[in-house]
Amino acid sequence: MRFGITIKPDMPVERIVALTRQAEASGFQYGWIFDSHVLWLDPYPVLTLMASNTKNMRLGPCVTNPATRDITVTASLFATLNLISGDRMQLGIGRGDSSRRVLGKKPVGAGDLERAVKAFRELTAGREIDYEGQPTRLSWAKGSPPVWIAGYGPKVLDLAGRVADGVILQFADPDLIAWCLGFVKKGAEQAGRDWRKIEVMAAAPVWVSDDLKLARERVRWFPALVSNHVVDLISRYRPEELPPALTSFVRNRGGYDYQHHCEVESSNANFVSDDVVDRFCLVGPAEAHREKLRRLASVGVTQFNVYLMCGDEEDTLEKYKKEIVPAFR
């Protein structure tokens, strides 16, 4: 099991850099950052600083999408950052949620996502593509970064199995992750790939404390975030195609205010029960975290990504350094 962090870039860049450096020193191998350019700071200048202030940590957005920026722009950004970082960049990409919704736009389709991933790979490797009828090549690009695809639905998970180096699953529910990986495995088999070589990330917030009530309140915002994707899934799939453990919790959901996206104690999360918090997040004393991580590893998770945005972030890193990470070395 490897460990990563994700930063929400709503804090001073100096603190983002300090947290990233602390995470690397604490045994975290991946440093990710949200990409929602209207709500928060643009991730790419910040990633440049993160790269300049770390030595070995692999870095990237968790996640970008094909529509916010033209794929030639994204490819050029990554090819440049790969040169700056010494080949440490990773592309996390999905259909788009907050970065699209705040503009009144919908997430892109799985077909557009697949075309973007293929173009990204070719461009960052310095190979020519046909871009809307125009031969296009980044002649100076050297080496294509690994691609992680984020998703919940069968189509995108199948796509991840066919073309991705890794899959990003935004929850820490072992049973739901096992369900998701069934589609990843199917896609890999269809493409003649060994699915066991595909990295699997579980991403979720954590709170280490004997005070379970407090811990739950610090992370309750996260299932509300997940609910946006679930509501989208329900609109596109028949009920029997989706597990009730994923869909039933949104039954009493109200509206969602993206201006309070990923915000501790946001009213967006008023409908989220303790049971869902416990399934989707990691809360409680250190041993509860270790046990949940062992269960995640048993279903195939290779990286646990801490959504580091619940307050007291330095303390969370210190607790993981001392009480969690060493158990998985």
Predicted segments with their positions:
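Alpha-helix-loop-beta-strand connector modules within alpha/beta enzyme cores
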Residues: Y44-T64, T68, L123, Q190, ...
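Short, acidic/polar
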Residues: M11-A23, T74-L77, I149-R162, R218-V219, ...
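Conserved, mostly hydrophobic/aromatic
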Residues: G27, M50, L81, F120, ...
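Acidic (Asp/Glu)-rich catalytic clusters
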Residues: T20-A25, L47-R58, F78-M89, G161, ...
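N-terminal beta1-alpha1-beta2 module of alpha/beta enzyme domains
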Residues: M1-C62, P145
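Glycine-rich, proline-tolerant flexible connector loops at the mouths of alpha/beta enzymes
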Residues: Y30-N53, N65, D97-R100, F171-P174, ...
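Hydrophobic faces of well-ordered beta-strands that scaffold small-molecule active sites
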Residues: F3-I7, G31-I33, R58-C62, M89-I93, ...
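An alpha-helical appendage that flanks or caps ligand/catalytic pockets
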Residues: K106-T136, I177, F183-S298
